[in-house]
């Protein structure tokens, strides 16, 4: 099972302080573990702070976007999920058209026409060790659904959790993750 380019959608009763009502975009999943970016948790960092560090202006298309809190790991670093993939110093391809980049060069070029079409900027990331995500899935902590670029890039972050459930065709209020466990 490879969940790269999928959303993890937290079950409604998840109690973890960070992951409660989270949608995590899985960027890499293999036998060694998984890495993803939470796409619906705003961070205290502003776009002004990010772009002033690069000496570039915030692109008009991103002026009202929030910087996401991608996860609790390496919160001092920035990560960009973007299209097209491009040729950056430190990127991993997630799908045919989406990449995760952690190098500054993508931020420095984001306002250049044609360099980056769509982008979600985050600080930190989420990770799971070998077998950990599979155990959490078996414990009914998460639902999975193939990623949707519209949810990832176009829908306001506060609506992404509901949109991911809608893509699954499920009403989150009707779910109880403890079903089937004695």
Swiss-Prot record:
Domain of life where this protein originates: Bacteria
SUPFAM superfamilies cross-referenced by the UniProt entry: VC0467-like
InterPro entries: AlgH-like (IPR003774)
Any one GO CC term of the record: cytosol
Similarity comment: family membership: Belongs to the UPF0301 (AlgH) family.
Gene3D superfamilies, per the entry: VC0467-like
Source species: Neisseria gonorrhoeae (strain ATCC 700825 / FA 1090)
NCBIfam families (alphabetical): PRK00228.1-1
Protein name listed in UniProt: UPF0301 protein NGO_0569
Residue ranges of coiled coil: none
């Amino acid at each position: 099972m490879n969940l790269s380019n999928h959303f993890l959608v937290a079950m409604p009763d998840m109690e973890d302080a960070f992951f409660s009502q989270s949608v995590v975009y899985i960027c890499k999943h293999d036998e060694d573990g998984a890495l993803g970016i939470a796409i619906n948790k705003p961070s205290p960092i502003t776009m002004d702070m990010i772009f002033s560090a690069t000496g570039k202006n915030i692109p008009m298309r991103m002026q009202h976007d929030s910087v996401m809190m991608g996860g609790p790991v390496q919160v001092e670093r920035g990560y960009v999920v973007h299209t097209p993939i491009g040729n950056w110093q430190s990127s991993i391809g997630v799908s045919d058209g989406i990449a995760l980049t952690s190098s500054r060069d993508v931020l420095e070029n984001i306002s250049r026409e044609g360099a980056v079409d769509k982008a979600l900027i985050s600080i930190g990331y989420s990770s799971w060790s070998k077998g950990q995500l599979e155990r959490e899935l078996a414990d009914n902590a998460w639902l999975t659904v193939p990623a949707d670029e519209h949810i990832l890039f176009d829908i306001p972050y506060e609506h992404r959790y509901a949109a991911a459930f809608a893509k699954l065709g499920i009403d989150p209020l009707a779910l109880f993750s403890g079903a089937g466990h004695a």
